[in-house]
Amino acid sequence: MRVISGSKKGRSLKAVAGTSTRPTTDKVKESIFNMIGPYFDGGRGLDLFAGSGGLGIEALSRGFEHCIFVDRDFKAIQTVKSNLKTLELTKHAQVYRNDAERALHAAAKRETGFRGIFLDPPYKEQKLKALLTLIDEYQMLEEDGFIVAEHDREVELPETVGDLVMTRKETYGLTGVAIYKKRG
């Protein structure tokens, strides 16, 4: 695993030890950022099922100024922190060990908005529609923002969730990727 582009291009990322996480492949990550970017002039991101932190770190490398990383797995949190330290990105990040729904509630209380939200839950525990509903209800997505929902290709996600509209859907092997933006 590596950073594909931007200020940290080519740098290696550690993967989470064991089989509890499924990192986004470099090919899928590159495709995702070609769909949403590829580069950014500032903005805040939320990597909600961070794993090794690959998606949020890629966003930072490509111009996001800050990213919040959330995962409930202790080994994943340690790996994110290690990758951020190695890449000298710790001052641009906050890392929390938390459940996804609790993390969304906490961010909503702080009235935190995001330019980019990355949702890549374990394929066996996908509650993407419920998470998209919370993001919409809490109005967490900025006007020009996007949500990347990575999922098992067999999962059918809704075209709309409240004011969120799926603008693109792609499949890469066993992985599906859906991009949502605000209606408007």
UniProtKB/Swiss-Prot annotation:
It comes from the Bacteria. Keywords: Methyltransferase, rRNA processing, S-adenosyl-L-methionine, Transferase. GO terms for molecular function: methyltransferase activity. It is an enzyme of class 2 (transferase). InterPro entries: RNA_MeTrfase_RsmD, SAM-dependent_MTases_sf. Its EC number is 2.1.1.-. GO terms for biological process: rRNA methylation. Residues 1-22 are annotated as: Disordered. Belongs to the methyltransferase superfamily. RsmD family. May catalyze the S-adenosyl-L-methionine-dependent methylation of a specific base in rRNA. PANTHER family: METHYLTRANSFERASE. This is Putative rRNA methyltransferase YlbH. The lineage of its organism: Bacteria, Bacillati, Bacillota, Bacilli, Bacillales.
